[in-house]
UniProtKB/Swiss-Prot annotation:
The keyword Transferase applies. The active site is at D164 (proton acceptor). Belongs to the spermidine/spermine synthase family. One of its GO terms (cellular component) is cytoplasm. Homodimer or homotetramer. Spermidine binds at H67, E91. It comes from Pyrobaculum aerophilum (strain ATCC 51768 / DSM 7523 / JCM 9630 / CIP 104966 / NBRC 100827 / IM2). Transmembrane segments: none annotated. This is Polyamine aminopropyltransferase. Involved in the biosynthesis of polyamines which are thought to support the growth of thermophilic microorganisms under high-temperature conditions. It seems that long-chain and branched-chain of polyamines effectively stabilize DNA and RNA, respectively. Catalyzes the irreversible transfer of a propylamine group from the amino donor S-adenosylmethioninamine (decarboxy-AdoMet) to norspermidine and 1,3-diaminopropane to yield norspermine, and to spermidine to yield thermospermine. Keywords: Cytoplasm, Polyamine biosynthesis, Transferase. It is found in: Cytoplasm. The keyword Nucleotide-binding does not apply. It is an enzyme of class 2 (transferase).
Length: 291
């Protein structure tokens, strides 16, 4: 660990013209992998933070809002989620949340960057909380696109696919995983009542990228849910798009959500029946241009 002797700050770009400035107290990791720049630092306001290619991915103090919102609406909406595929999510927090559901028998996490996974195991224990060692976990270091294509050839099937990738506009690593064609492959990988959910960046600063992801999901799934949640360390509300082949997350009551969470032994800090209803009724925030 390198202590920061003077004021060093991270400037995270929110858009091409706006940045979030964050004071760094200590640097644990600063390196470039084969695929991206990796930074793990300590900050006052957000705690230990993972940064990839200058974009914050997760921070100790607020990561639950992102990961619980990404995972639980989809997994809870499915009545019997047994097999779950996670694309991305190298720090292990998405895997952690998936494994809270005792119905899950197999959770496959596929991340292209093995350095992120190994560094997260060492420096981000509060995020993964031992999820990598759970006997239900299967961690694969490979391109998510290639994994999905090969899984289709093998005849694999999943109940839920969770896409916890870098933003569609932040780097080139995951761009091909946001295309309509790829969502079509995901649809084929799902069982007949399967669900996919993806983070979709920010609809305010990058409306075109968000709409591209949304239309890709809409073109392949009959049931759609759009929702968002404010993430302080991101400096914006992150958007999510859920696509379902049968089960509608809007149809669940708060009581039914709480019942499923209780029956499955899920202990969440943010997500609940009331939170589910709120998320499903959250408007998508976009710029309102007045001339």
């Amino acid at each position: 660990m390198s202590k920061v002797p003077g004021p060093i700050v991270l400037m995270e770009p929110l858009s091409g013209k706006t940045s979030l400035i964050i004071k760094i107290n200590a640097i644990h990791v600063s390196k470039r992998s084969k695929y991206q720049g990796i930074l793990i630092v300590d900050t006052d306001d957000y705690g230990r933070t993972l940064v990839l290619d200058d974009y914050i991915q997760s921070s100790y103090y607020d990561e639950i809002y992102y990961h619980e919102s990404l995972v639980h609406p989809a997994v809870t909406t499915h009545p019997r989620p047994s097999d779950v595929l996670i694309l991305g999510g190298g720090e292990g927090a998405t895997l952690r949340e998936v494994l809270k559901h005792n119905t899950v028998k197999r959770a496959v996490m596929v991340d292209i960057d093995g350095d992120v996974v190994e560094l997260s195991k060492k420096y981000l224990p509060q995020m993964h909380q031992g999820a990598f060692d759970d006997p239900r976990s299967e961690v694969r270091i490979e391109d998510g696109f290639v994994y999905v294509e090969n899984a289709l050839k093998r005849g694999e099937k999943f109940d839920v696919v969770i896409m916890d990738l870098t933003d569609p506009y932040s780097s080139d690593i995951a761009k091909q995983l946001y295309t309509p064609e790829f969502f079509g492959k995901v649809k084929r990988l799902l069982r007949e009542d399967g669900i996919v959910v993806t983070q979709a960046g920010n609809s305010f600063y990058f409306p075109e990228a968000y709409d591209y992801v949304l239309q890709g999901v809409k073109g392949n799934f009959p049931i759609i849910a759009e929702y968002s949640v404010w993430i302080p360390s991101f400096g914006y509300a992150v958007n999510f798009v859920l696509g379902s082949l049968k089960h509608d997350p809007h149809s669940l009551s708060a009581e039914e959500v709480d019942k499923r969470l209780s029956e499955r032994g899920v202990r969440a800090e943010f997500y609940s029946g009331k939170t589910h209803i709120a998320l499903m009724n959250m408007p998508v925030i976009k710029k309102i241009l007045r001339v």
